[in-house]
Amino acid sequence: KDEPASGAQLDYLIGAAEETRNQALACLAVLNTYKTVVVYDPADAVMIKRTYGEWGLTLTAAVVTYPAFLAERFAAAALTVPQTGGTLTYQDPFALARDLGETEEARKIVNAAGHTVEMLCNRKDTMWAGNILMSEWMPDVIARVAADRIINAKNVGADTIVCASVSEYASLKNAAPAG
């Protein structure tokens, strides 16, 4: 409810402009009222965990990504994971994998849910699966990118792609064949 934008989307669209910095400062003021903040969107996580520091902004709250938060809960036996019965593969969000080096946290949860296989191009070598923002001006390209990633998953025998990025999830869902 009271979550101002991190500045990640503006940074993507217009770079480190004054509007972007102002958005980041407004977000930082709210984040610093908390002890710990769980960040759901990988792009926001990179903005908050890395870019704020690069800009000299002081973050006092501990910031953890959603996959890392879930993995911590799972390791502490505070979270159980139901078995899926299918074959799963994890779609590494490039922002978590490349920018933050976070690739294993989500796998701890996915591996506990069932049989897991790895797509070619995983972890830091991940292949992008789409972007909500970019689909506004190049929908055909984003649809193709997502469709290609679905093919990658099928080629390794996966029937389910698990995503940590809402943006990639939306792109994959839109590109998925009916049924």
Question: Model features per residue range: what roles?
Answer:
Residues 1-179:
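Iron-sulfur cluster-binding electron-transfer modules in prokaryotic oxidoreductases
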